[in-house]
Amino acid sequence: KLNKRTFNKFSVLYRTNAQSRALEESFIRQGIPYNIVGSVRFYERKEVKNVLAYLRLIVNLKDTISLRRIINFPARGIGAKTIDKCVQQSEKDKIEFIEVLKNPDKMDIRGKQSDALHKFYNVIIKYHELRKKLSASELARSLVEEIGILSHFKESKEPDAKDRFDNVAELLTSIEEFSARNPKAELSTFLEDVSLQTDIDNWNDSENRVTLMTIHSSKGLEFPVVFISGLDEGLFPLFNTLDDKNELEEERRLFYVALTRAEEKVYLLYA
């Protein structure tokens, strides 16, 4: 609390959704309750959960829930019927789901789908064997690059592809920071930390929380005290607006929106 203010008198604003990750982790470490407005919490975002599912499967090959979540992410032509065949074969042979993927011919799966299953299986096994040899950061970055997750979002025409790209990049940054703090820690320890953060989020249901949101989401709202974070060239204003006068002017207008969310005090933060 600042000057005996309650948490709900404060708001922290940022330019892009991906910036919330560092803020959320800091708030959790300090025991500060918070709400995310206009988005979901960082580790609950679909693309982040997909990458985490890859990492969980690499740590535990028996994690069928994670396997089914990402067997066709990014899209590799493995449809629901193929997955059902794999499940049935796994139950018939009484072996783990992951094991049936190395022999798709046995399930009468051929052609591109067979190749896709083989490739997926080989990647998972490769990184499962590397999990104790590489740092969490090295493993995650190499995996994401080999699978092509960032390039998938970079090439996507979906309107939120840039946000999803940024979120995956921010997740990799989070893992790098973890590895720097814990150079001897394995990937499983990072995943335990993420699970703990999620548990803390779900446990604290108080309404007296700091509000975290993008500047766009803050339009029409006001708070006694506002922190505007990430005022660094390339982040706010965004890098791709610096050479366009109209885009740069829009960034100025957005900054004005952020400033005027504060009723009493505003703090400008930069790295």
Feature names for model-found ranges:
Residues 84-89:
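C-terminal helical "lid" of AAA+/P-loop NTPase domains
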Residues 51, 55-59, 67, 71, ...:
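Conserved RecA-like P-loop NTPase helicase motor core
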Residues 1-68, 155-166, 173, 185, ...:
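Conserved motor-region signature of P-loop NTPase helicases/translocases
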Residues 217, 226-233:
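Short Ser/Thr-interspersed hydrophobic loop/turn segments at strand-loop and sheet-helix junctions
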Residues 6, 74, 100-217, 221-222, ...:
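Accessory C-terminal helicase-associated subdomains
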Residues 231-271:
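C-terminal accessory regions
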